[in-house]
């Protein structure tokens, strides 16, 4: 297991359950799942049928803990590729990682609704914002007209 390493001048260590801040939301998840690890998830993120995993790493900065999230893709021989960084220097002590089908879901704070969902884009060989095209969670279209170009009412979500 990858416990500690240096990348781009930063000394990072694997985030542990004890790096999570205590909260009612976290206790509720522990009650539901029994064994709950907020900073490690596994699944098939690239659709190749091989197990992949995402792991948060911790950097101890002057202002506290900063989390970096990496995905490790599985290989044909049962090992994993080098880390592919998805999120850098985020606050995650009150949040967690999850996988929803083939999406990596990063929730910075369990008590708040906003999440960031990342989809692997094989053609670009990188993770992209899964909600960017759909506009999910955006408020920049509030000034848009109430009708679409074909004169049908716009559905407000």
Feature map (PLM): residue ranges:
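Acidic, small-residue rich beta-repeat scaffolds with periodic aromatic anchors
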Residues: 1-11, 79, 89-157
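Acidic, divalent-cation-chelating loop motifs in proteins
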Residues: 40-48
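Short consensus segments that form the blades of beta-propeller domains
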Residues: 29-31, 58-63
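Structural motif
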Residues: 62-70, 113-116
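Surface-exposed loop/edge segments in extracytoplasmic proteins
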Residues: 78-84
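Acidic/hydrophobic-patterned starts of short beta strands in beta-sheet-rich repeat architectures
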Residues: 47-57, 101-107
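Terminal domain-start segments
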Residues: 1-38
